[in-house]
């Protein structure tokens, strides 16, 4: 099974991928192999997590293992459509025979090879609400390419979740913990001030 997980920087895609994969792998008794998750502390997680070196050799990992690659476009990025897909891409065509479950994390699905987008079993997108602790989590069986357009998710399953602070220290976010602190947009604050002033002047 291939899952693509997307979201803008600071929208919790890596944090929530770690949380969700860890809980599922632990419940199923599966081992997780990860690449490019900076400063990950496996001892703080429930499942067994191991670092591996070459994402292009993902298919050589033990059968039935779970695989997570952050900033996956570095190894599974787009290519000239006239070129033949390399082995580490075509191997996804028959991955069900080995029981691998792969999670590719990137900011935008269009950063990934079109071959993978067509083979994807599930697309999870995270959308942070007003830079707060609240997120919208969208899930679709097919890849939704225009992730910058909110209406693109009208047919996706939607769930509201919150950033879990317990996972802030599990890995080193390139954004830093301060990036996850709530911050209301300036336009929203100004609008509230105008409304408050109007109410005050009406008395």
Language model regions located:
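Cytosolic/nucleoplasmic/matrix-facing N-terminal domains/tails
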Residues: 1-167
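C-terminal single-pass membrane-anchor helix
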Residues: 169-203
């Amino acid at each position: 099974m291939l899952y693509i997980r997307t979201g803008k920087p600071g929208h919790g895609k890596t944090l929530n991928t770690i949380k969700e994969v860890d809980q599922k792998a632990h419940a199923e008794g599966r081992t997780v192999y990860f690449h490019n998750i900076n400063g990950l502390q496996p001892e703080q997680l429930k499942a067994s997590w191991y670092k591996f070196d070459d994402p292009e050799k993902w298919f050589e990992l033990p059968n039935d293992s779970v695989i997570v690659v952050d900033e996956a476009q570095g190894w599974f990025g787009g290519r000239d459509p006239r070129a033949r897909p390399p082995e580490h891409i075509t191997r996804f065509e028959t991955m069900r025979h080995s029981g691998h479950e792969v999670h590719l994390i990137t900011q935008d699905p269009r950063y990934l090879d079109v071959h993978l987008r067509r083979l994807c079993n599930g697309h999870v997108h995270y959308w942070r609400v007003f830079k707060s602790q609240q997120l919208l989590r969208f899930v679709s069986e097919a890849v939704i390419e225009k992730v910058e357009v909110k209406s693109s998710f009208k047919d996706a399953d939607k769930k509201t979740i919150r950033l879990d602070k317990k996972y802030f220290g599990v890995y080193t976010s390139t954004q830093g913990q301060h990036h996850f602190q709530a911050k209301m947009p300036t336009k929203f604050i100004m609008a509230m001030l105008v409304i408050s002033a109007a109410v005050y002047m009406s008395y």
